């Protein structure tokens, strides 16, 4: 093999982003051949899913932008419940809170159901082993992973969106040897890496607050992940230490 070309687990989130950018370029390049003759249907699905996995972040970011623009427009919109023609019957806006609730619950199911099923499986094993410690570690581990993944998701949303734009603009990521052993990351370097995330987080928070404090609460998971991108990135390079003994149900 080419020296240093093999892939391994990156030691911190900055190196994850570097690897992710390289993988994104490879997967998005497949869009050029996914429609070519000679591929099986499953092969097309496989290539399409690989490319889509790096486009989803951009779609998520775009949906947030569109949602905030609509919220800003809604705050300045003066409703009119009557047409220009004279009528005694108002035209009420169509609002379907039931559909919104169903969509919200479906989203929660997609995000949390796999975690819940995994936790239930571990609790079942803990009960069979009569191990309170196993059950406690499993529960703490799921809670820790849920919070940490919530904070990391907005970070990757920004980096993957920027990466996709760079790829479509023709910018090559190259293939440098991956850092595997030394995961050290200074707090300064972490904050420098996260400066764009922090700026976007502050801007989103300010706009959301201007529209409605309720909107800021609704967007709190995204805003928190962006504003805390620096400290969270720094934490990914720190050793887990004693915490790993109480947060991971490993065997």
Protein language model regions, located:
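Non-transmembrane catalytic domains and loops of membrane-associated enzymes and transporters
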Residues: 1-142, 146, 150, 238-251
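Transmembrane alpha-helical segments in integral membrane proteins
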Residues: 109-125, 160-167, 206-213
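Membrane-helix boundary/interface segments in integral membrane proteins
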Residues: 163-188
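C-terminal amphipathic alpha-helical interaction region
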Residues: 179, 187-251
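Hydrophobic, aromatic-rich membrane-embedded alpha-helical segments
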Residues: 146-164
């Amino acid at each position: 093999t080419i020296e240093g070309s093999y892939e391994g687990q990156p030691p911190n989130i900055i190196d994850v982003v570097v690897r992710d950018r390289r993988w994104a370029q490879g997967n998005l390049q497949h869009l050029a051949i996914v429609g070519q003759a000679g591929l099986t249907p499953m092969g097309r699905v496989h290539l399409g899913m690989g490319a889509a996995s790096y486009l989803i972040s951009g779609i998520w970011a775009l949906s947030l932008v569109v949602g905030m623009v609509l919220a800003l427009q809604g705050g300045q919109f003066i409703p009119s419940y009557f047409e220009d023609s004279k009528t005694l019957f108002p035209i009420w806006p169509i609002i379907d809170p039931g559909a919104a609730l169903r969509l919200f619950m479906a989203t929660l199911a997609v995000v949390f159901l796999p975690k819940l099923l995994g936790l239930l499986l571990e609790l079942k094993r803990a009960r069979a082993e009569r191990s309170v410690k196993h059950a406690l570690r499993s529960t703490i581990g799921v809670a820790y992973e849920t919070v940490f993944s919530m904070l990391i998701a907005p970070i990757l949303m920004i980096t993957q969106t920027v990466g996709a734009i760079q790829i479509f603009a023709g910018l090559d990521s190259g293939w440098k040897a991956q850092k595997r052993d030394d995961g050290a990351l200074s707090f300064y370097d972490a904050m420098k890496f996260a400066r764009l995330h922090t700026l976007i987080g502050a801007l989103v928070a300010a706009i959301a607050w201007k529209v409605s404090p309720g909107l800021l609460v609704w967007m709190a998971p995204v805003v928190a992940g962006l504003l805390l991108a620096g400290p969270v990135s720094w934490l990914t390079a720190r050793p887990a230490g004693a915490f790993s003994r109480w947060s991971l149900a490993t065997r």
